């Protein structure tokens, strides 16, 4: 028995290299290469091929396949002599080709030297090329339906059953039959069949959770579904201020402007800024229906019409976030005199820097306003610098940098609100060049910041050096140096520019820029969350048009039968829930969640019960959405055909 399982060494040597058969074996790879990695008879007359990278002869592909040398042979234990004889490989067995399943296409007998070692790098990714579903013989081999048939060669039979291309409907519930028979998302230009289709990603629900601010636990329930109360309150106040009117105000109606409302908080005439008394009104344009801020110069007589045309042409090019955009200028006599009107963008609930920082407070004692924080001052400096950079780049000058002509809105946002007025008023009398006016802008800029820092109006700054020295006690030396550079006159032969000033405050500009980006992220977060509210509103309006409605054809029980009755029960499930003790359940989250699931048409199941508990339905939101769409589409169809009762 031992001799049967373990033959003598002289018998095992016969397995080394098959017996030579002549030159017909020169293309056959030696079996020792595959088993041991080398052949010791290569230099001793072995006629088989020892080059691993050489492709075998095509003629060997169709040789006899009656024996596979890799498969184990049946060896009876009772015949040891036969076993010793079969251990020697014949040349016919050496020439046998590997086993290849039927229907796999043209076989490839190329093998590597490390066939027994797994090499991931040698595996190439499958990429279909020149694939035609209508070609049933794409691989050039007869099609067989045996157990080893290639699934890719049998796809041709599906070509006749696939529908043709049609229109893709984004809002369809069944995405396997979109837009009717044969609808598919991609046109029929490609070579792949149209399988089950899905809506694009932007049509699905995805919560926006990239921003989250610290809130108290009792605030989170409402905050999770709506914008913050403070932001909503500010927006509502601005909307109310925009629509505010004053009945019997006595203000005239201009040619294209109506509903004038005064915005001045002081009724005293002040001629220090423009040389004429100026007033500000809110008005609505009858052509655009938008609201504008009208600044009126009382008693001005226009002597040169080119002044308005030339100045407005240049200032309309200024588009900057820290400059109030001017739209037009015109003259009128509706106020009982010759007045010059400038139309600017209207920013509701805005205050001037004069009113916010330099207005003394009245109490038990008359006291000066409190000091402005340094970070707020740097924010003002960065914003005014941004405005002057745009104005000076267009070869213009602001000329009106006064606390009473710079408005302040929410989040310390400031804007220059009286630009272009002095250019029109002093169009003929001005003798200074644009470069000189720009140098004056820098000096006025420095005095403005100094006035805000010291709490004294610019007209009361008699001793500039004393005011600069007083900054050291409340602010940093960097702020003092920046203000001193703006106020100081330029050296002979040199001229200061806003670009030089920007390079000096680059650190503070980047800090302010970062704060602006954070504020933009917060607003974008709230906007993205409110984006889905339109879907919920549409679902509610559609649902209310279906429920408790008589049939357009005349039947009064249309909404109480069929699918409409289940929608009515869904209405009760969403809005008319009660607690175990009979108290109304007013959970806003439940209402929003159910309506969102209905609009999305998810597979979640919901139990709908009638009010008498006699009828119970177990449905999915997908089925409810299909019922919902069919019922509403029926109403739409009757509304287009003009059926009686369609407008009930």
From Swiss-Prot:
Q: Where is this region: Pseudokinase domain?
A: 244-506
Q: Which GO terms describe its cellular component?
A: P-body; PAN complex
Q: Mind listing the UniProt keywords for this protein, alphabetically?
A: ATP-binding, Coiled coil, Cytoplasm, Metal-binding, mRNA processing, Nucleotide-binding, Zinc, Zinc-finger
Alphabetized GO MF terms: ATP binding; poly(A) binding; protein kinase activity; zinc ion binding
Q: Where in the cell is it found?
A: Cytoplasm
**Where is region (Knob domain) located?**
546-648
Q: Which residues bind ATP?
A: 295, 345-352, 404-405
User: C3H1-type zinc fingers: which residues?
Assistant: 24-53
Domain of life from the UniProt record: Eukaryota
Q: List the disulfide bonds.
A: none
Q: Would you kindly state one Gene Ontology biological process term found in this protein's UniProt entry?
A: mRNA processing
Q: Which SMART domains match?
A: S_TKc
Q: Where is this region: Disordered?
A: 1-24
Coiled-coil intervals, chain numbering:
507-545
InterPro entries the UniProt entry points to: Kinase-like_dom_sf, PAN3, Pan3_PK, Prot_kinase_dom, Znf_CCCH
**What is known about what this protein does?**
Regulatory subunit of the poly(A)-nuclease (PAN) deadenylation complex, one of two cytoplasmic mRNA deadenylases involved in mRNA turnover. PAN specifically shortens poly(A) tails of RNA and the activity is stimulated by poly(A)-binding protein PAB1. PAN deadenylation is followed by rapid degradation of the shortened mRNA tails by the CCR4-NOT complex. Deadenylated mRNAs are then degraded by two alternative mechanisms, namely exosome-mediated 3'-5' exonucleolytic degradation, or deadenylation-dependent mRNA decaping and subsequent 5'-3' exonucleolytic degradation by XRN1.
Q: Which PANTHER family match?
A: DEADENYLATION COMPLEX SUBUNIT PAN3, PAN2-PAN3 DEADENYLATION COMPLEX SUBUNIT PAN3
Q: Which family does it belong to?
A: Belongs to the protein kinase superfamily. PAN3 family.
Read off the HAMAP family from this record.
PAN3 (MF_03181)
Q: How does it assemble?
A: Homodimer. Forms a heterotrimer with a catalytic subunit PAN2 to form the poly(A)-nuclease (PAN) deadenylation complex. Interacts (via PAM-2 motif) with poly(A)-binding protein PAB1 (via PABC domain), conferring substrate specificity of the enzyme complex.
Q: What does UniProt say about this protein's domains?
A: The N-terminal zinc finger binds to poly(A) RNA. Contains a pseudokinase domain. The protein kinase domain is predicted to be catalytically inactive because some of the residues important for catalytic activity are substituted and it lacks the equivalent of the binding site for a peptide substrate. However, it has retained an ATP-binding site and ATP-binding is required for mRNA degradation, stimulating the activity of the PAN2 nuclease in vitro.
| Name this polypeptide is given | PAN2-PAN3 deadenylation complex subunit PAN3
The upper taxonomy is: Eukaryota, Fungi, Dikarya, Ascomycota, Pezizomycotina
């Amino acid at each position: 028995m031992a001799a049967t399982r373990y033959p003598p060494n002289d018998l095992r040597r016969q397995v080394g290299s098959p017996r030579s058969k002549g030159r017909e074996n020169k293309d056959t790879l030696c079996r020792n290469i595959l088993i041991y990695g080398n052949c010791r008879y290569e230099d001793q007359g072995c006629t088989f091929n020892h080059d691993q990278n050489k492709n075998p002869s095509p003629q060997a592909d169709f040789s006899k396949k009656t024996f596979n040398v890799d498969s184990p042979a049946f060896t009876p234990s009772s015949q040891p002599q036969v076993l010793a004889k079969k251990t020697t490989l014949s040349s016919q067995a050496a020439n046998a080709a590997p086993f290849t399943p039927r229907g796999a296409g043209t076989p490839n007998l190329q093998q590597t030297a490390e066939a027994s070692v797994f090499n991931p790098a040698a595996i190439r990714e499958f990429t279909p090329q020149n694939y035609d579903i209508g070609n049933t013989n794409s691989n050039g081999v007869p099609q067989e339906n045996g157990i080893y048939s290639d699934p890719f060669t049998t796809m041709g039979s599906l070509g006749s059953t696939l529908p043709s291309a049609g229109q893709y409907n984004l809002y369809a519930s069944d995405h396997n039959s979109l837009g009717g028979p044969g609808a598919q998302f991609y046109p029929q230009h490609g070579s792949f069949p149209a399988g089950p289709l899905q809506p694009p990603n932007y049509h699905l629900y995805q919560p926006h959770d990239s921003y989250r601010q610290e809130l108290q636990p009792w605030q989170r329930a409402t905050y999770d579904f709506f914008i913050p109360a403070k932001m909503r309150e500010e927006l509502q106040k601005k909307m109310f201020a925009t629509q505010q009117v004053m009945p019997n105000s006595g203000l005239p109606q201009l040619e294209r402007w109506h509903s004038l409302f005064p915005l001045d908080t002081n009724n005293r005439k002040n001629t220090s800024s423009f040389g004429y008394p100026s007033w500000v009104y809110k008005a609505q344009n009858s052509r655009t229906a938008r609201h504008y801020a009208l600044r009126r110069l009382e008693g001005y007589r226009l002597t040169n019409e080119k002044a308005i045309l030339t100045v407005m042409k240049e200032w309309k090019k200024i588009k900057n976030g820290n400059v109030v955009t001017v739209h037009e200028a015109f003259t009128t006599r509706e106020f009982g005199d010759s007045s010059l009107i400038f139309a600017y963008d209207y920013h509701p609930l805005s205050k001037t820097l004069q009113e916010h920082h330099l207005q003394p407070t009245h109490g038990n004692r008359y006291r000066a306003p409190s000091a402005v924080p340094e970070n707020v001052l740097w924010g003002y400096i960065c914003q005014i610098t941004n405005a002057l950079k745009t104005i000076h780049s267009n070869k213009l000058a602001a000329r009106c940098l006064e606390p009473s002509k710079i408005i302040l809105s929410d989040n310390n946002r400031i804007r220059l609100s009286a630009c272009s007025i002095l250019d029109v008023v002093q169009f003929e009398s001005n003798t200074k060049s644009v470069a000189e006016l720009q140098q004056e802008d820098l000096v006025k800029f420095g005095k403005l910041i100094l006035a805000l820092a010291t709490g004294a109006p610019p007209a009361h700054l008699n001793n500039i050096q004393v005011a600069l020295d007083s900054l050291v006690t409340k602010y940093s030396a960097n702020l003092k140096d920046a203000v001193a550079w703006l106020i100081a006159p330029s050296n002979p032969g040199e001229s200061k520019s806003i670009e030089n000033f920007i390079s000096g405050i680059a650190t503070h500009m980047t800090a302010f820029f970062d704060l602006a980006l954070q504020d933009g992220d917060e607003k974008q977060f709230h906007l993205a969350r409110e984006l889905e509210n339109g879907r919920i509103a549409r679902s509610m309006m559609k649902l209310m048009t279906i429920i408790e409605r008589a049939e357009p054809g005349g039947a009064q029980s249309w909404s109480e039968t069929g699918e409409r009755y289940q929608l009515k029960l869904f209405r009760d499930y969403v809005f008319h829930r009660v607690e175990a003790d009979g108290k109304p359940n007013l959970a806003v989250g439940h209402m929003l969640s159910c309506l969102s699931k209905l609009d999305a048409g998810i597979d979640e199941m919901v139990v709908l019960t009638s009010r008498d508990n006699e009828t119970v339905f177990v449905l999915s939101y997908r089925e409810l959405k299909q019922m919902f769409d069919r019922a509403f589409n029926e109403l739409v169809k009757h509304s287009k055909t003009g059926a009686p009762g369609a407008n009930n």
